[in-house]
Amino acid sequence: MKRILNIGLAGLVLLGGIAAVSAQPSGRGGQRCPSFQQQPPVLLRSSDWWNDRSGFPPTYTAGAKTLPLISVKGNKFVDPDGKTILFRGLCISDPDKIAIQGHWGKDHFVKVKEMGAMLVRIPVHPISWRERGTAEYLKLLDQAVQWCTELGMYVMLDWHSIGNLGLERLQDPMYQTTKWETYNFWDTMARHYAGHNTVAFYELFNEPAIDKPGSGQRFGIYPWEDWKKICEEEIAIIRAKNPQAIPMVAGFDWAYDLTPVRNSPINAEGIGYTVHPYANKRPQNQWLTKWEDDFGYVADKYPVMATEFGGFAAPPGAQPLGGGGRGGGGNAAYGPAIIKYLEGKGISWTVWCFDPNWGPTLISDWNYTLNSSGLFAKAAMAGEIK
């Protein structure tokens, strides 16, 4: 009864207001304004939102079945005949950066192919994804996929952020993202490249990083079990649209530490793990022991790929041309040690970075002059590092 009474009072107030408005003179000879005859303005809309499907870009199918499908069998990546494939490849820089600097084109990928790459890792930064926009960024990726298909190279898409996605505390502005944006990115990729054999790998998050107890509050603490849940949610999103894709999962410590996998692996089939084994992660006299303890053991049961590392001295007999930067540049022992270890364990790899600005670099300039690290990487891709 009280609710009915309130409605009644509101109705009286409304009617009173209407009466007051209708009683106002129009300013033209005292005539009253026909308020009840006025029609609401027609809103001009660019489209009918209920028919808008622009959020779901069409599937990219050009050359989708040109390259053989890659899948997971046990701890290996295999082709349709069951043959084990050990990938050797490299990372380019963000397509948005390359395009802005005027170097985007098939010729860039021809240079990658000339390095001997079987696999191209393509990093997509959250900031470039947002600023270029979905439709325009997909145009770049479609071109990359087309060129890689024509050149016989597979593609790994990498959501290139660094930090604690769970708490959304990231390292730098270029890496700022949210769980929602990350999930939406992978939903978009899975829809757009569903069934495309060239786009074989989805690296879910470039470098997860958390604070260690007592180390400050840069990223915050985050349990492995919670990170594992996020990864499993991403995998479910991808698999709902593209069951053949191979999701790749990274551990903490900037994608170096896979020790939690021993007791709590990701609860999903047909996936792989990634590692970034830069030389400075462990003391040189502990490399082999720590590599085995920290990530190598995982390769005994699951596929593993070292998706980022570099900073090599030139191979024997090659003229050093400088470069290197972060993570062991100039350390003559590092390159042979890590390549021999990875390939001895059957771990595929992509080296960083085919760009003259982002270290450790492989090229010294946009004339594609190979520096010491680039010369070593090219020799390694040719199987010359024994």
Segments (PLM) and residue ranges:
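Sec/Tat signal peptide C-region and signal peptidase I cleavage site
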Residues: I18-S22
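Feature marks short, surface-exposed loop/turn motifs that line or immediately flank catalytic pockets
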Residues: D94-D96, P126-R130, G163-L165, P208, ...
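Bacterial N-terminal signal peptides that target proteins for export
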Residues: M1-L9
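Extracellular glycoside hydrolase catalytic/binding regions
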Residues: L67-L69, Q101, M174, Y183-F201, ...
